[in-house]
Amino acid sequence: RKENPLPAVCGRICNRRCEFECTRGDIDQPLAIDEIKKFIADQELDPATRFIPQKMHDYGKKIAVIGSGPAGLSCAYYLALDGYNVTVFEKENRLGGMLTLGIPSFRLEKNVIEAEIDILKEMGVMFKTGVEVGKDVTVPELRTEGFEAFYIAIGAQGGRKLGVEGEDAQGVISGVDFLRK
């Protein structure tokens, strides 16, 4: 977790480019580094044995992270680890951003994302879902609640167009919209 706050997620969605360059493949086969990382990270997801990092300091300062995708979760992890009181605001009712809404479960199981988020919760990170900053609550309002800094990690939730004939036809939706439903 020192270099990667979401190791179980990365162990599942990594495209394994390093394996194609692994010199071990010159002898027999490359190291299956993604499977190794996945195995190690899975051991840490077990609530009975997982390691919860301790805060290095206790600054007592509140920071708002806007968005709970990988950037927001990573930011929340490192800020909490350093000793800040972090609250993550997510406009959707589910945490994880595109990890949850944009990656199918056969590729990244939802319970893995939830377990990674549970570690953040045990580190003291607070989460507020169904709250769109700028609409449901404003930055000035958050400042009056004591938040001194803001990290905006709203991501890129939209699907991409392919540039093919018929993609604007009625009933055609993006892959992201399909996964959300």
PLM regions: where:
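N-terminal Rossmann-like dinucleotide/flavin-binding domain of flavoprotein oxidoreductases
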Residues: 1-4, 17, 36, 99-147
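Glycine-rich dinucleotide-binding loop and its adjacent helix/turn
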Residues: 40-57, 115-135, 159-181
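Residue-level detector of alpha-helix initiation sites
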Residues: 5, 69-71, 94
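Glycine-rich FAD pyrophosphate-binding loop
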Residues: 84-100
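N-terminal Rossmann-like FAD-binding beta1-loop-alpha1 element of flavoenzymes
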Residues: 61-87
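Glycine-rich loop-to-alpha-helix module at the N-terminal edge of alpha/beta enzyme cores
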Residues: 1-24
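Short hydrophobic core segments
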Residues: 66, 89, 147-155
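Iron-sulfur (Fe-S) cluster-binding segments and ferredoxin-like electron-carrier domains
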Residues: 16-42
